[in-house]
């Protein structure tokens, strides 16, 4: 299948790596995101009992993202798993030292019944459109520093999110929120990473204001928006406060940026939220494509609930976001989908690979194209999913353009 004829794109952001199929926030997941052409890759940052920084989506998710409850460390969890109790466990990074966390195996973010055994709880519940295939070799929980090393080695850029603490701050009475925010930035400084390569994020906007006021990493700091109202009364005051404090980028979930319009060619149009943000000079990043199972319903698709959607509508959404809204980039659980789109429409590509070949150029390709994408920074392997999604599209000009890039090499 396709390899060197696609290139990475900074429009394509690896959400927790490539966590549709790889255990989130593992080096394996980050490597998979790089192979799929994510130009920017995310580490969600939280801290351990000894205030070391590790990559986890939440401070208290170890019970669903690792095997901790089947180990002796279960006893140290904030709420240990007790078989037969019917009580859900809660295991936090701050319950353990870094050395202890490094003994755990990461896994797909899921859980079975709390009424079963510890093994059934740990290894149950993975959605059937995901997979457990890549979790049984015991991938480890990476430190933030390890994520910087791995992501940088793949030629990708960085978007760390400082996770909101689940414990009282200052932690242990001494480790303040500002200490935490500064420590994350310091690890990029120590690694020699230029600020232009980093988009630090937080839902706590005081963190973003801190980076702007106190570090060289504030110019691309991202204010995540979890105020999901679609009314102007909800988002205009937010935009004004961000601008007043020097913020340049806001990041809402993707459904806030589009609305259903049965008269539009792609059946989606730019939302008032997007228009108002841009009117105030804010750039936009959004999240998260490929987070939803078959059917395209629920949270991420609620603003187009009246549209009878097909799987291929993901590409129509991407086109509206890229060319009508004008977003900087989009997080995806499977970056290959976004990378494929970005190559076809020349969106924020990185490198010199040739893309969207003509029929004549495709016919001239060699029968075999072999690239070790895992060890090469600039070669991309997308796999079959983007091509399947094209097949699932409605007939329109977007499908025609994407179809010219379906390189299946025998």
Task: Describe each model-derived feature in a short phrase.
Residues 395-401:
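Low-complexity intrinsically disordered segments
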């Amino acid at each position: 299948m396709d390899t060197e004829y696609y290139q990475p794109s900074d429009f394509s952001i690896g959400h927790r790596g490539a966590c549709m199929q790889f255990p989130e926030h593992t080096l394996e997941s980050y490597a998979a995101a790089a192979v799929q052409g994510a130009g920017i890759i995310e580490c969600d940052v939280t801290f351990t009992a000894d205030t070391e920084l590790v990559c986890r989506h939440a401070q208290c998710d170890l019970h669903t993202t690792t095997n901790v409850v089947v180990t002796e460390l279960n006893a140290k969890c904030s709420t240990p798993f007790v078989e037969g109790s019917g009580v859900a466990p809660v295991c936090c990074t701050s319950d353990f030292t870094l050395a202890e966390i490094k003994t755990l195996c990461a896994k797909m973010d899921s859980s079975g019944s709390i009424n079963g055994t510890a093994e059934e709880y740990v290894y149950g519940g993975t959605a059937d459109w995901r997979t457990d295939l890549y979790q049984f070799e015991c991938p480890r929980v990476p430190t933030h520093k390890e994520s910087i090393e791995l992501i940088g080695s793949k030629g990708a850029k960085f978007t760390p999110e400082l996770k909101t603490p689940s414990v009282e701050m200052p932690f242990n009475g001494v480790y303040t929120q500002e200490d935490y925010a500064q420590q994350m930035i310091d690890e990029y400084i120590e690694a020699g990473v230029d600020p232009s390569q980093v988009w630090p994020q937080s839902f706590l906007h005081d963190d973003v204001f801190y980076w702007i006021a106190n570090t060289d990493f504030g110019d691309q700091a991202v204010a995540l928006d979890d105020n999901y109202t679609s009314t102007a009364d909800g988002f205009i005051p937010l935009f004004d406060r961000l601008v007043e404090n020097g913020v340049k980028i806001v990041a809402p979930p993707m459904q806030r940026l589009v609305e259903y319009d049965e008269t539009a060619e792609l059946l989606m149009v730019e939302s008032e939220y997007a228009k108002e943000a841009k009117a105030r000079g804010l750039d936009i990043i959004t999240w998260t494509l490929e987070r939803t199972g078959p059917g395209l319903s629920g949270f991420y698709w609620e603003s187009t609930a009246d549209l009878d959607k097909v799987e291929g509508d993901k590409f129509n959404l991407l086109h509206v976001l890229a060319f009508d809204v004008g977003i900087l980039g989009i997080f995806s659980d499977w970056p290959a989908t976004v990378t494929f789109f970005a190559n076809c429409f020349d969106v924020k590509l990185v490198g010199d690979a040739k893309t969207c070949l003509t029929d004549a150029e495709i016919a001239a390709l060699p029968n075999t194209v072999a690239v070790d994408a895992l060890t090469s920074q600039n070669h991309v392997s997308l796999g079959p999913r983007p091509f399947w999604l094209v097949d699932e599209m409605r007939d329109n000009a977007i499908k025609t353009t994407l179809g010219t890039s379906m390189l299946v090499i025998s």
